[in-house]
Amino acid sequence: MRAMLLLLICCLVSSFTLPAVAAQPGRVGTDLGLVELPVAQASSAPMVVFMSGDGGWAALDKGLSAQLQAHGMPVVGWSSLSYYWKKKTPDQATADLVRILTEYQSRWGRQRWLLVGFSFGAEIVPFVINRLPPAYRDSLVGAVMLSPSTASDFEIHVSDMVVHDKAGSYPTLPEVKAIKSLPLLCVQGADDDSPVKLCPHLQQPNVTTVTLPGSHHFDDDYGVLYRSIADRLPWTGEEQDH
């Protein structure tokens, strides 16, 4: 009887903890740490590759991806915690991004794509854009950097999960400056007190900087975060020049 009661309690608890979005493990390779958020309806909206923060596929990554998915954009979530637990190089990361795009552009029938990164993932964004083969760069409609810092190490450091003032060995600003015409969005929190925020340093015409309420995680308001992106990036059915 005691075992039956324990089983019943476990079932009741699990019923209240089911995720709002039916995310699925990615199929490209277990080495990449992918999560799939597909959509059922055909649409001209692009697919999204979402590079997570160093905490892995966590609350902000899930929350914003659910918003993107709800608006017709299938998402491939890429866990930085899994992938960068061992150090990578920009070239390695780009090669694996190409693997992801080759698989999902075909499977989901979406050639156009949007690149989104949060925190650690945001710092990777300009590096991989600058190293993409032309065909994949040409199908990229824009990129979003959420709470990026001025440098990355392409490797997870546990201390960085607590303190966001790291001095990485790969500066992000020169990489952003090398992207001349692709629409870029840099989003920061008004209360983010990190001394190494990237957004205030970005002045080029193809970069839009947005400041939202909250700190590093934008008060967990994923609807406002989604709208700040959707209102500023041309990701509808219109083809974009690069």
Describe each PLM feature range.
Residues 6-15:
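Bacterial N-terminal signal peptides
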Residues 38-73, 77-80:
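Short, surface-exposed "cap/lid" segments of acyl-processing enzymes
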Residues 207-242:
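C-terminal catalytic histidine-bearing segment of alpha/beta-hydrolase fold enzymes
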Residues 116-125:
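Gly/Ala-rich beta-loop-alpha elbow adjacent to hydrolase catalytic centers
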Residues 20-43:
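N-terminal cap/lid segment of alpha/beta-hydrolase-fold proteins
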Residues 143-154:
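Active-site nucleophile loop of the alpha/beta-hydrolase fold
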Residues 153-204:
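The feature captures the conserved acid-bearing segment of alpha/beta-hydrolase catalytic domains
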Residues 87-108, 127:
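Alpha/beta-hydrolase active-site loop
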